[in-house]
A protein has these predicted regions:
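Glycine-rich, proline-tolerant flexible connector loops at the mouths of alpha/beta enzymes
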Residues: 26-49, 61, 93-96, 178-181, ...
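Conserved, mostly hydrophobic/aromatic
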Residues: 23, 46, 77, 116, ...
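Hydrophobic faces of well-ordered beta-strands that scaffold small-molecule active sites
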Residues: 3-7, 27-29, 54-58, 85-89, ...
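N-terminal beta1-alpha1-beta2 module of alpha/beta enzyme domains
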Residues: 1-58, 152
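Short, acidic/polar
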Residues: 8-19, 73, 158-166, 227, ...
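Active-site mouth loops of central-metabolism enzymes
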Residues: 1-10, 60-68, 148-159, 213-216, ...
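An alpha-helical appendage that flanks or caps ligand/catalytic pockets
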Residues: 102, 106-143, 189-319
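Alpha-helix-loop-beta-strand connector modules within alpha/beta enzyme cores
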Residues: 40-57, 112-115, 119, 344-352
Length: 352
């Protein structure tokens, strides 16, 4: 099992170097322009201040920039950290919805990845913009402005069946989430469907999951304020995703959110209509909105997190590994991130 952290704050590159020293395998840098620092700037600093930890976007949002711009961005980082750079890429949950815009559609997303993939191989490929199509290719590759000689794996973010199938069809890996991406066996079955469509092998394919973790100390209870603050922002980020997903898809909410679904919708409807999209995602994986703390109950914590004493967490992670999961990543609340990545490394990773 591989372990990763997530960060995005330009002046806290020390968190990444600390994670590297603690034995973490990889780091995701988020791409959410209305909330976080610019991912390319963060990655450039991380590349220069680390030596072994793998770094990349987790995830770059296709709707925010042209495909050649994304390819150039990650290839530039690869020049600074050759052989340990990857590109996580998605349609855009928070990044698009925080502007009141929908994520990119699946057909456009597949074409976007195709273009990025070809460019990162140094190839010429047809590219269409504003209805006009021309061949494009990175020029003057021998000048080393970028690095497309060392492979850059593309990990496709897939929290639903369609994008999970797409990951299996064209990606080098899948990034899903627990619980909102379904179970790992379900996700991998979708990946296999995608691979079967193009008759490709999944021999080197890797699957990663964004998880919510809660490591309890002796005597701690799920109702303790410190416990709620530790896992609350991650849980509510999942809730915010489901609110938009149900609204856009027309699908019923998943079972794990039903215990407080109606109550949360009533709460959300009372917000300023014009700014609902901003308020919904403002606290995204950073802090627990005080007005939302009431929704974090012991039952909800159990449904949304890998929780328990360290030994119990080890067993839960080993079970996920047995299903075929290759790596997990978590996002710690901003004010607790150093302590949590250290506690997790000392008490869980070291026992794996």
């Amino acid at each position: 099992m591989q372990f990763g952290i997530t960060t995005s704050k330009i002046d806290e590159i020390g968190l990444i170097t600390r994670a590297e020293n603690l034995g973490y395998d990889f780091c995701w840098v988020t791409d959410s322009q209305m909330i976080r620092s610019n991912p390319w700037a963060v990655l450039a600093l991380a590349a220069q201040q680390t030596r072994s930890i793998r770094i990349g976007t987790g995830v770059a949002v296709a709707g925010l920039r042209l495909a050649p711009v994304t390819a150039n961005g990650i290839a530039t980082i690869n020049r600074l950290a050759p052989g340990r750079t990857f590109l996580g890429i998605g349609t855009g949950n928070t990044a698009m919805r925080a502007m009141g815009q929908p994520p990119m559609g699946i057909k456009a997303f597949e074409e976007y990845i195709r273009v990025v993939q070809a460019l990162l191989k140094g190839e010429e490929t047809d590219y269409t913009l504003n209805g006009v199509t021309h061949p494009i290719q990175f020029q003057n590759q021998d000048f080393k402005y970028i690095d497309v000689e060392n492979p850059i794996p593309i990990h496709v973010s897939g929290f639903g069946p369609k994008t999970q199938v797409l990951a299996g069809k064209i990606g080098d890996g899948l990034i899903t989430g627990i619980p909102r991406g379904g179970t790992i066996p379900q996700a991998l079955e979708n990946v296999k469907k995608g691979a079967k469509k193009v008759n490709r092998s999944l021999h080197s394919f890797e699957t990663f999951a964004l998880v919510n973790i809660l490591m309890l100390k002796p005597g701690q209870k799920l109702t303790d304020e410190l416990v709620i603050q530790q896992c609350g922002s991650a849980i509510m980020a999942n809730v915010h995703f489901v609110v938009d997903w149900v609204k856009e898809s027309g699908n019923p909410p998943p079972d794990y959110i039903l215990p407080f679904w109606d109550e949360y919708l009533d709460f959300h409807k009372k917000r300023d209509y014009k700014r609902k999209h901003m308020k919904l995602h403002q606290s995204h994986y950073s802090y627990l909105d005080p007005d939302e703390a009431k929704f974090i109950t012991p039952e909800i914590i159990k449904a949304f997190t890998i929780a328990g004493q360290p030994a119990e967490m080890v067993e839960q992670i080993k079970e996920l590994e047995s299903y075929g999961l290759d790596g997990i990543n978590f996002i710690a609340p901003l004010e607790q991130q150093y302590r949590l990545i250290e506690d997790f490394a000392y008490n869980v990773i070291s026992k794996m």
